[in-house]
Amino acid sequence: MTKALYVGSFDPITNGHLDIIKRAAKIFDELTVVVAINTNKSALFTPQERVNLITQVTRDLENVACKSVTGLTAETFTQEKADVLVRGVRNGEDLNFEIQVAGMNQYLNQEVETVFIPANSKWEFTSSSLIKEVVKMGGSIKGLVPETVEVLLKSRLK
Amino acid sequence: MTKALYVGSFDPITNGHLDIIKRAAKIFDELTVVVAINTNKSALFTPQERVNLITQVTRDLENVACKSVTGLTAETFTQEKADVLVRGVRNGEDLNFEIQVAGMNQYLNQEVETVFIPANSKWEFTSSSLIKEVVKMGGSIKGLVPETVEVLLKSRLK
Amino acid sequence: MTKALYVGSFDPITNGHLDIIKRAAKIFDELTVVVAINTNKSALFTPQERVNLITQVTRDLENVACKSVTGLTAETFTQEKADVLVRGVRNGEDLNFEIQVAGMNQYLNQEVETVFIPANSKWEFTSSSLIKEVVKMGGSIKGLVPETVEVLLKSRLK
Amino acid sequence: MTKALYVGSFDPITNGHLDIIKRAAKIFDELTVVVAINTNKSALFTPQERVNLITQVTRDLENVACKSVTGLTAETFTQEKADVLVRGVRNGEDLNFEIQVAGMNQYLNQEVETVFIPANSKWEFTSSSLIKEVVKMGGSIKGLVPETVEVLLKSRLK
Amino acid sequence: MTKALYVGSFDPITNGHLDIIKRAAKIFDELTVVVAINTNKSALFTPQERVNLITQVTRDLENVACKSVTGLTAETFTQEKADVLVRGVRNGEDLNFEIQVAGMNQYLNQEVETVFIPANSKWEFTSSSLIKEVVKMGGSIKGLVPETVEVLLKSRLK
Amino acid sequence: MTKALYVGSFDPITNGHLDIIKRAAKIFDELTVVVAINTNKSALFTPQERVNLITQVTRDLENVACKSVTGLTAETFTQEKADVLVRGVRNGEDLNFEIQVAGMNQYLNQEVETVFIPANSKWEFTSSSLIKEVVKMGGSIKGLVPETVEVLLKSRLK
């Protein structure tokens, strides 16, 4: 029985994130999507809004749960009795950043292992920040985020 | 007849930008340099100042025009009846960022094609931000930007 | 009037190459695909076979011609009265190699300019060498190369 | 129940490989190490020798099996009823190569998913080829490969 | 007689920085660690606090001195009669940034030469910013920074 | 007193190598250029020819010596009583390879330290292999290698 955690800010969830969730849910027996609350960064959606959106768009995935957590991922890993952290990577630059975070997590908690799932090349250009910028400039993000997220983003950034 | 757009913030134009402009003007029949106005970012020079500087330093290049635009590059591409977007790249990191932006532009407007011109290695270390930082610290940027830009930068950052 | 050259070994042409050809043909007024004959490397198909395959799969693209050439690209550039060289790039590693080749070409012939077209992420994992390896191991490459190429490859590598 | 495959040439297995095996065996319920036989490449050890070495150095890992296979990994994936392919990555360059191979594997067999485990920085500089080169030049590789491998390598490359 | 400068913000010094200092002190006859004061950036520790910390943790290294400087590194290089600048690099991304800074320093002062020391892989995941973030979230950074720094960090970020 | 070694195949020396030699000779008190003889690789020039060429083009650099060596660099480091190994790097890819070699050298001999000198962007596109290829195809390499090397290369590759 293998339990994975997918930790991120998901502000908001994009179809790129959703693709990683679906593929991780297929690989691992259990997947918990964790909205990491970072009090040092301003966010567009509250933690609860983000959890609601993720829960809604993953409702068909039986082995996927979602929660929000403050504090260190290395501690959440133990609290959640996880076996592995999952992260998506698009290119060498993502990898350099993720190797640093994975190294720090394993330093803080020797049990923590991280695996990287290569992003589907279809979503290679998506990121929450670029999508929010396009919405602010009046662009259509249809197909880049789940519909419920699209509606909420437009109203929030009108 | 091939029309290219070179879109950026140009805050201000550097000799690295100017090198890309001259080479793109040689490759393509028509080149329009577009100062992209981003209301979410503070700039040192107003859009009009940036357009004036670019117009002045490219006055000898007959097939080069310059304007400032708010809004999405993907829309400007259609409004300007362009055939291609041009961007300069210095290294793998620039490329990762540019591939993401090019992917989003093509998603928003299927007609958009982007080509990358390899930066002349002579200007590999220049960027508007690093040049502004050097001026703030009293360094000489002679030869890194056109003279008119150098004079204006010094007075603005005195 | 802008004439581009797309120089490569094309041993054989893949759908990744064909995607670059179609997009370059859309950007530039004229495109010549040049099969570069490298006497130091063994090839699976003869130069003429490669030219025939390319000519056949680009027959609907009116502004695209194809020929094979021995000798330096920097010299072919002048002989063909080209304005620009076109190359596809998938990631930072491709870029490092291409920047080196572009730098040497411009050193040998100052007129040579090179632009890079970002590979369509759909074809990011294709390359002639990986496709040939898959065929040798009995895998199906349907959809990765034009059909005529698929048939010829299978018979050649049976 | 999650079954992973770790496919490679392992010519021979190094402590870097062994580290990935141990960590994958901890993450997944079952791990099969597959020695991929590539008839196009010359190898130092026979497939059976490589399987024997791997089997011996992983004997304490109950959920780890080892076998050699010719043919496509995408087919082995189905034959072995695997859930995921596992590969180690050290840097951006490894990732670019692995993303290409993972993309081809998923093209050949849609069920194939690949995850990358970041190499332990301790083994970042090891590779079978560099280790063989050091042995050929009389260097000591103590600690870089399991002892049995060290003994066999020295005798084979004397 | 070779004198090196190691210039950075060191806000605060980490064991990764200390590793570079020890190795540079072994390579070069003289090493001056320079705390670069950047009035445009907010810092956690004052320049004097940073100098005190560095002086304390390098007290056993006879050929190492420390000072803080405002102004351009290219000018400090001449004032300090240095022969070379030393910087640590962990991966390709660090290198791209460092090549840009080294290029600008050499443009501002032709005498400036920069050499890069590969970070010890043990400290590959450490950086002042990530360490401060972990402390803010209540994590233990024991072993990542010298003890005196650990104590001061905890009190400062309580 | 700091003694550096610059180890490579130099088959043949290029102006890119020479630039690294001149800059290393300026930084360090003593520099020995070591032609590493690799019996597993075919070379265009004999070790002695390479040493003669290097000796000739560095005759004005008083603190530079040259020799050829078989065997491990880690052992040569001790025999030559060196303080540091010097290597040139052009981009992230070079760095990944050099970090691996530096890691292995330090593993084989804990005393070995390696520093990287950023290649002058002017020579970023040069490499012995690319230069030999251009000569084979009849191209002019004037200015890319010292004149004596140019003459010898042309006659050898006629």
Curated annotation (Swiss-Prot), chains A, B, C, D, E, F:
- What keywords would UniProt list here? ATP-binding, Coenzyme A biosynthesis, Cytoplasm, Magnesium, Nucleotide-binding, Nucleotidyltransferase, Transferase
Query: To which pathway does this protein belong?
Result: Cofactor biosynthesis; coenzyme A biosynthesis; CoA from (R)-pantothenate: step 4/5
A GO-annotated cellular component: cytoplasm
Molecular function (GO) terms for this protein are: ATP binding; pantetheine-phosphate adenylyltransferase activity
Asked if the record carries the keyword Nucleotide-binding, the reply is yes
Compartments, record wording:
Cytoplasm
**Could you say which residues bind substrate here?**
9, 41, 73, 87
In this chain, ATP is annotated as bound at 9-10, 17, 88-90, 98, 123-129
- Site (Transition state stabilizer): give the residues: 17
Q: Name one Pfam family in it.
A: CTP_transf_like
Gene3D superfamilies from the UniProt entry: HUPs
Which cofactor(s) does the record list?
Mg(2+)
Question: What reaction(s) does this enzyme catalyze?
Answer: (R)-4'-phosphopantetheine + ATP + H(+) = 3'-dephospho-CoA + diphosphate
Q: Kindly give the InterPro entries that the UniProt entry links to this protein.
A: Cyt_trans-like, PPAT, Rossmann-like_a/b/a_fold
The EC number on file is 2.7.7.3
Q: Could you tell me the Gene Ontology terms of the biological process aspect for this record?
A: coenzyme A biosynthetic process
> What is the similarity comment for this entry?
Belongs to the bacterial CoaD family.
Q: How does it assemble?
A: Homohexamer.
Q: What does the UniProt function comment say about this protein? A: Reversibly transfers an adenylyl group from ATP to 4'-phosphopantetheine, yielding dephospho-CoA (dPCoA) and pyrophosphate.
Q: Which NCBIfam families match?
A: coaD_prev_kdtB, cyt_tran_rel
Which PANTHER family has this protein been placed in?
Answer: PHOSPHOPANTETHEINE ADENYLYLTRANSFERASE
Protein name in UniProt: Phosphopantetheine adenylyltransferase
